[in-house]
UniProtKB/Swiss-Prot annotation:
It catalyses: S-ubiquitinyl-[E2 ubiquitin-conjugating enzyme]-L-cysteine + [acceptor protein]-L-lysine = [E2 ubiquitin-conjugating enzyme]-L-cysteine + N(6)-ubiquitinyl-[acceptor protein]-L-lysine. Monomer. Part of a ternary complex composed of SMAD3, ITCH/AIP4 and NEDD9/HEF1; within the complex NEDD9/HEF1 interacts (via N-terminus) with ITCH/AIP4 (via WW domains); the complex mediates ubiquitination and proteasomal degradation of NEDD9/HEF1. Interacts (via WW domains) with OCNL. Interacts (via WW domains) with NOTCH1. Interacts (via WW domains) JUN. Interacts with JUNB; the interaction promotes ITCH-mediated ubiquitination and degradation of JUNB. Interacts with FYN; the interaction phosphorylates ITCH on Tyr-381 decreasing binding of JUNB. (Microbial infection) Interacts with Epstein-Barr virus LMP2A. It is a peripheral membrane protein. Residues 356-432 are annotated as: Required for interaction with FYN. Signal peptide: none annotated. It comes from Mus musculus. On T-cell activation, phosphorylation by the JNK cascade on serine and threonine residues surrounding the PRR domain accelerates the ubiquitination and degradation of JUN and JUNB. The increased ITCH catalytic activity due to phosphorylation by JNK1 may occur due to a conformational change disrupting the interaction between the PRR/WW motifs domain and the HECT domain and, thus exposing the HECT domain. Phosphorylation by FYN reduces interaction with JUNB and negatively controls JUN ubiquitination and degradation. Monoubiquitinated. Autopolyubiquitinated with 'Lys-63' linkages which does not lead to protein degradation. The keyword Transferase applies. It is linked to Defects in Itch are the cause of the itchy phenotype which is an inflammatory and immunological condition characterized by inflammation in the lung and stomach, hyperplasia in lymphoid and hematopoietic cells and constant itching in the skin. One of its GO terms (biological process) is protein ubiquitination. This is E3 ubiquitin-protein ligase Itchy. Residues 195-206, 230-259 have a biased composition (Low complexity). The modification Phosphotyrosine is found at Y381.
Length: 864
């Protein structure tokens, strides 16, 4: 009994806490050839449940931080260093780990850690024998008296056995997610040290902190559920020092007196007297605990909480339920929670923070849907104006049909052509068919187009150009229908598809992406293929889904990926205006150090959409389409981007600025991320005054600057990727609005056109299920119609010709409704064939419920 006092005093000295400053200097990491851009490493330091992180260094294998981190340690603590690589769109990757024993480091440095620089070897997480690099750190601010070492080595060796593997493995059963011990493990270890016979005798005050400790300690993580929480958990108080460790004992004599240091909020070394429990920490007054909860203190002085209702413990202080929530118990004794506002239930206990985050997510989702709906409406008028000419029956831009040909319309409203000379019919227009099936040019010849769309021919052998076609000997200037042909939009599309077929490569490529990391997976795969491979047929695979890609999966991939890459939240693009939800390049995209690589990737992706005839979810501004077409932008293009700035330039153009006394110079200011910079429109423009004579030049230059300010590098990177897949000259006979429709499709859903061009299998137009279906389509709003269209066809965009020109895996494929299944089945879709499997429901309400559930909740491919 006489030896117990000194032993406990010695352990109190060894468990006394002090600050340690760790300066993470630099690292030398092993290169990974699979990572093109290099890792973005940062260091996480964990010790005794604490976790501190450094800033990240972008794209380097030799990072330098020189960042100080302060932690609370004891002489028996063990530091764990983890080097992570930050990932933008997925979880961070662990590059290597290293451990450091403070006790051994103190012994090797004369019990003082004052600016001690150490180089630690990083090892792999899965293979500890693999060297991943070196990490340099500096330790400072810790000092221990020498008598602690001479008298306390045995206690140190015993007490440090708790965390020997805490750094080598991430799933240690005795260490929680951030390194803190469970309450039962801590209690068991403390009893062994306090009551064991091998505890050495130490003098008081052996461990002295060289710096004042921190005023508070971060809360420990949630422990495992204890074996018993009814009342005070049972503990074994035998003389051999064993303990059950189910929970920290609560029937011990706890000294609740506070010293002068405790009142100031400092951490006090634990004083154990006669086997009694530790002194609890002086906690700040908080809100009362919910009913059924109790606050306790374990033998390390750590506060934990007991839920007597659910019979569990946790380190986190419980919060009361948010307003409107109620806790209930079902017939099997399971606890669930009821939200009386939304009339929903959940197994997970809600918190104020989780409810607030959910409400914020709902608000952002509704705002995004509203923005997209406004964007969709923007294209309705444009399409009507675009096709006004093609709907004029008195004017045919292709000219008259060849002799012996006749144009007819079938019962479904589709146009076909009759050749009375050979008595055959065909869908293709003979005027465009002959132009698409021309003979190949001689070797060394190339056909190009002027700005007006007139074809001319380049003889690379003699380095000459001519309008005369070397195949026919006729001049392209004399071919009137050819010029009219390139001015008709539908014919332009056919001609463009013809050239895409000429550039296409045989076979196909597989693109495997997951929905959770769609952006990053698509970026890695598209940039890993050569441009020629990306011209092959695309075979998109979503792992875990049974869909076979006959065109429908690729359509959804383009739709989903375009929604991701063009999201303004990534700071690569921004909305063109407050009320204009078209996109343009964000001048502040440089805050992402890899933004030029992403713009090259987006250029490839947009060109792939045009090349493969797929649609994207979001469109660009008209000036950006002009840049794709290599057409100049001017003052008129500024009106759709910045109306206020446009009106001010119009005022300058129409008024005498000299009479108004305006002092303007050939210099403008721009603000990016709060920083204002001056830009000269011409050399020494800050000293050149704008006058009536040169204001036209000023207006032209300032309009060009406004449309291209700060995005020159991004635009160049975009076109580098774009031209690798599809050279821009193949688009030069389109205008900006036509290119917009070609890339995004038509936005207006014509119900009459939809119903007129639908076909049925095992149903008829008069079947009650079909009549109910069209009644349902008429009742829902425009947004749900688009979702229904996306559910069946894979995209909410329509081709140029509307529902009559819907394409499937085998060519033209109309919207089809087939009678399949039983009345208790959900509708299924076959996006590759534009087919909806509609079971024979018994009532309209049942059909409406099943269809709404299908289009709202279904995601992925599970079709045959």
């Amino acid at each position: 009994m006489s030896d117990s006092g000194p032993q406990l005093d010695s352990m109190g000295s060894l468990t006394m806490k002090s600050q340690l400053q760790i300066t993470v200097i630099s690292a030398k990491l092993k290169e990974n050839k699979k990572n093109w851009f290099g890792p973005s490493p940062y260091v996480e330091v964990t010790v005794d449940g604490q976790s501190k992180k450094t800033e990240k260094c972008n794209n380097t294998n030799s990072p330098k931080w020189k960042q100080p981190l302060t932690v609370i340690v004891t002489p028996t603590s063990k530091l764990c260093f983890r080097v992570w690589s930050h990932q933008t769109l997925k979880s961070d990757v662990l590059l290597g780990t290293a451990g450091l024993d403070i006790y051994e480091t103190l012994k090797s440095n004369n019990m003082k850690l004052e600016e001690v620089v150490m180089t630690l070897q990083l090892v792999g997480d899965k293979e500890p024998t693999e060297t991943m690099g070196d990490l340099s750190v500096c330790l400072d601010g810790l000092q221990v008296e020498a008598e602690v070492v001479t008298n306390g080595e045995t206690s140190c060796s015993e007490s440090t056995t708790q965390n020997d593997d805490g750094c080598r493995t991430r799933d240690d059963t005795r260490v929680s997610t951030n390194g803190s011990e469970d309450p039962e493990v801590a209690a068991s270890g403390e009893n062994k040290r306090a009551n064991g016979n091998n505890s050495p005798s130490l003098s008081n005050g052996g461990f002295k902190p060289s710096r004042p400790p921190r005023p508070s300690r971060p809360p420990p993580p949630t422990p495992r559920r204890p074996a018993s929480v009814n009342g005070s958990p049972s503990t074994n108080s035998d003389s051999d020092g064993s303990s059950t460790g189910s929970l920290p004992p609560t029937n011990t004599n706890v000294n609740t007196s506070t010293s002068e240091g405790a009142t100031s909020g400092l951490i006090i070394p634990l004083t154990i007297s006669g086997g009694s429990g530790p002194r609890p920490l002086n906690t700040v007054s908080q809100a009362p605990l919910p009913p059924g909860w109790e606050q306790r203190v374990d033998q390390h002085g750590r506060v934990y909480y007991v839920d007597h209702v659910e019979k569990r413990t946790t380190w986190d202080r419980p919060e009361p339920l948010p307003p409107g929530w109620e806790r209930r118990v079902d017939n099997m004794g399971r606890i669930y929670y009821v939200d009386h506002f939304t009339r929903t239930t959940t197994w997970q206990r809600p918190t104020l923070e989780s409810v607030r985050n959910y409400e914020q997510w709902q608000l952002q989702r509704s705002q995004l849907q509203g923005a997209m709906q406004q964007f969709n409406q923007r294209f309705i008028y444009g399409n009507q104006d675009l096709f006004a000419t093609s709907q004029n029956k008195e004017f045919d831009p292709l000219g008259p049909l060849p002799p012996g040909w006749e144009k007819r319309t079938d019962s479904n409203g589709r146009v076909y052509f009759v050749n009375h000379n050979t008595r055959i019919t065909q869908w293709e227009d003979p005027r465009s068919q002959g132009q698409l099936n021309e003979k190949p040019l001689p070797e060394g010849w190339e056909m190009r187009f002027t700005v007006d769309g007139i074809p001319y021919f380049v003889d690379h052998n003699r380095r000459a150009t001519t309008y005369i076609d070397p195949r026919t000997g006729k001049s392209a200037l004399d071919n009137g229908p050819q010029i009219a042909y390139v001015r008709d939009f539908k014919a332009k599309v056919q001609y463009f598809r013809f050239w895409c077929q000429q550039l296409a490569m045989p076979q196909h490529i597989k693109i495997t992406v997951t929905r959770k990391t769609l952006f990053e997976d698509s970026f890695q795969q598209i940039m890993s293929f050569s441009p020629q491979d990306l011209r092959r047929r695309l075979w998109v695979i979503f792992p875990g889904e049974e869909g076979l890609d006959y065109g429908g999966v690729a359509r959804e991939w383009f739709f989903l990926l375009s929604h991701e890459v063009l999201n303004p939240m990534y700071c690569l693009f921004e909305y063109a205006g407050k009320d204009n939800y078209c996109l343009q390049i964000n001048p502040a995209s440089y805050i992402n150090p890899d933004h030029l690589k992403y713009f090259r990737f987006i250029g490839r992706f947009i060109a792939m959409a045009l090349f493969h005839g797929k649609f994207i979810d979001t469109g660009f501004s008209l000036p950006f389409y002009k840049r794709i077409l290599n057409k100049p932008v001017g003052l008129k293009d500024l009106e759709s981007i910045d109306p206020e700035f446009y009106n001010s330039l119009i005022w300058v153009k129409e008024n005498n600025i000299e009479e108004c006394g305006l002092e303007m110079y050939f210099s403008v200011d721009k603000e990016i991320l709060g920083e204002i910079k001056s830009h000269d429109l011409k050399p020494n423009g800050g000293n050149i005054l704008v006058t009536e004579e040169n204001k036209e030049e000023y207006i032209r230059m300032v309009a060009e600057w406004r449309l291209s300010r700060g995005v020159e590098e991004q635009t160049q990177a975009f076109f580098e990727g774009f031209n690798e897949i599809l050279p821009q000259q193949y688009l030069q006979y389109f205008d900006a609005k036509e290119l917009e429709v070609l890339l995004c499709g038509m936005q207006e859903i014509d119900l009459n056109d939809w119903q007129r061009h639908a076909i049925y299998r095992h149903y008829t137009r008069t079947s009650k299920q079909i009549m109910w279906f069209w009644q349902f389509v008429k009742e829902i709003d425009n947004e749900k119609r688009m979702r229904l269209l996306q559910f069946v066809t894979g995209t909410c965009r329509l081709p140029v010709g509307g529902f009559a020109d819907l394409m499937g895996s085998n060519g033209p494929q109309k919207f089809c409704i087939e009678k399949v299944g039983k009345e208790n089945w959900l509708p299924r879709s076959h996006t590759c064939f534009n087919r909806l499997d509609l079971p024979p429901y018994k009532s309209y309400e049942q059909l409406k419920e099943k269809l709404l559930f299908a289009i709202e909740e279904t995601e992925g491919f599970g079709q045959e």
